[in-house]
Amino acid sequence: LNLPNNVISGGINATSQLNTIKKFIKLNKIKKTIFLTPRLDYEDEIKKAISQSKIKIYKQYIYDTEPTKLTAQIEKITNYKIRKQNLLDELKRVENSDLIDKEKQLEKLKKRYTIGNVNFDSVIIADFDESLKSVITSLLYTDVSPKKKFIITFNQWFDESLLKEKTIQPIYYPSINKKNLENFENKFNKEFDAYPNYLSLLSYDLVGLIYYLSLNNDLTDVSKLFRKKNSFKGKIGIFDIENNKINHKLNLYQIDKEKLKEIF
């Protein structure tokens, strides 16, 4: 964004999220990660965040959100048709063989959907809501299971509908600290008899930051205040400040067996 010098942009941006995902990838010694981005208006922001976070991506793909196009694209990404043909070929080979345990092998093969692995350990999906569920469902259709590959998404704001989707679990995503969020919501509700939206949540800390800076600095050129590396601890979370950028230090969560768990 080309913002004036006296304007600050803050929030849970793509770079903040990828910094957290990068930490998770390192902790789990994940070697090959593919990145799936929908063909939407934030595509360029994602590309920039990948560069800024220096996260290692094996391959990047842009996909269409229209269901039939999406499924075909996921099939191509996962080499589904080749892996499906491998299974058909193996079934035919065993059927025509004289193996002693022929029936047992056939029984096992008929329970499978494909033969052959995919060339990645984890998938990052920069999507949300029903569109996200469609992508993961397409991965399941192509025999890529969250139980065998890490499925990582962007901040889902603790979407409770994901807890009910057993087939797409486990999944992982970065977000703000849930306890801090709940404390803020309760405080806000007591004061205003309503629950806050996410804009008010993020503004809560940012307004405090600007007030603090205004006490000791000239705000005619705000960008000068953010060139040195620094951190600001607010009520909601911690913000890292450096090179005129504000990044939110996030937690990482897992949804598995219909439960939410904080990983770090």
Regions found by a protein language model. Give the residues of each.
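Extracytoplasmic ligand/sensor domains, especially the bilobed periplasmic-binding protein
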Residues: 1-49, 55-60, 160
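Extracellular/periplasmic periplasmic-binding protein-like sensory domains
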Residues: 4-7, 14, 55, 75-84, ...
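Structural motif
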Residues: 17-20, 66-78, 102-109
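Sec-exported extracytoplasmic/periplasmic mature domains
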Residues: 26-30, 51, 55, 140-144, ...
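Short hydrophobic segments within beta-strands
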Residues: 35-37, 125-126, 154
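Short acidic, S/G/P-rich loop/turn micro-motifs used as interaction or catalytic elements
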Residues: 40-43, 129-133
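Segments of small-molecule ligand-sensing domains
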Residues: 193-207, 211-260
